[in-house]
Amino acid sequence: CALANIAARCWLIAQQRVGERRSCGVLDCFAWGNWLFSRIEGGDVVEGVLIKVAAFVAIIVAGYCAGRSNSFGKRPGEVVSKIVFTFTLPCSVVHAFGSAQFTPQLLVLVPIGLACAFVPYVVAAIVSRRCERGDRVFYMLNICGFNIGCFALPYVQALFSPEMAVALCMFDAGNAMMMTGGAYALTGLIAGTGKGPIEQPLKFVVKRLFSSLPFDAYLVLIILAVFDIQIPQQVVAFTEPIANANAFCAMLMLGLMIGFTSAGAKLKKVAIILGARALFSIAFCMLTLAFLPFDFMTKLVVCILLWAPASAMGPTFTLWCGGDEKLAGLSNGITIVEAIVIATAIVLATGVAA
């Protein structure tokens, strides 16, 4: 790599002296890479980011291999997901709030998170109104929302300051209104659940939301923050060991739930979901950078959240509504790979990691 960088530098110098721009594919690639790394403040940042990302990828791959080997039983993803959503994720949220300073301005991110999950859902509901019910369920439940608690939270906590984790929690509080039950309830009302109509839809949505421990944690902590009630340091210290386990458990859960089983004509539906999510992410990122009233670091974290994978509940809700859960699992797995690549590229290209 060192020799290649030297060759790339010599190639650029030679072109500057001759005054002519000629193409040499391999050397041009190394020259571009050399320019990219020169934009980052110090090699230690690059090394630290890549090591942490490599650890996340290794855990996901280990989870995928373990799930396929049946060494943890038939449905290990369900067991690990219960551990994450019951213990590690709520404790991680509590620890994030207790370790950083909250500012009321961050509350703006709650409706923004809700809007970023709700708008794609509405568009999918309108565009897919002539599709078969199973396909419509698949599009509506998998085009919206982000897996922030199990992917973006450990990612941001590993690479950014504690204050950024609080901003993330505000955004996810809005996102969770759709992804912990709102999308499922609306889909049941619009397309049906496959198990008959939902009686008392308002009660169903409220019950679904408040039965989610991460959402309950967000709600309580936001209320405490608004009234300027500090979380006792004893509570922060108590939750720290459990919160530290969230990154490993969440990434392992993602690996266990990845399924690459669908093929053929169904891949077109996956491509539609991936393309639509990418278009919405690009549009929301542009709006964030242009209009969000925060510093550049907070805007950057929001952009990373907008490229987070599809919600881990998407395949489950798809199954409950009578859709193709395996296809949902495939699209979910691809968005995880996409999120790792894009989030890492954003961090490396800007060089802002703590």
Specify the residue positions occupied by each region the protein language model found.
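Extreme N-terminal basic, low-complexity initiation segments
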Residues: 1-7
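Short, low-complexity intrinsically disordered segments enriched in A/P/G/S/L with frequent Arg
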Residues: 1, 13-24
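Alpha-helical transmembrane segments of multi-pass small-molecule/ion transporters
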Residues: 9-11, 22-29, 33-354
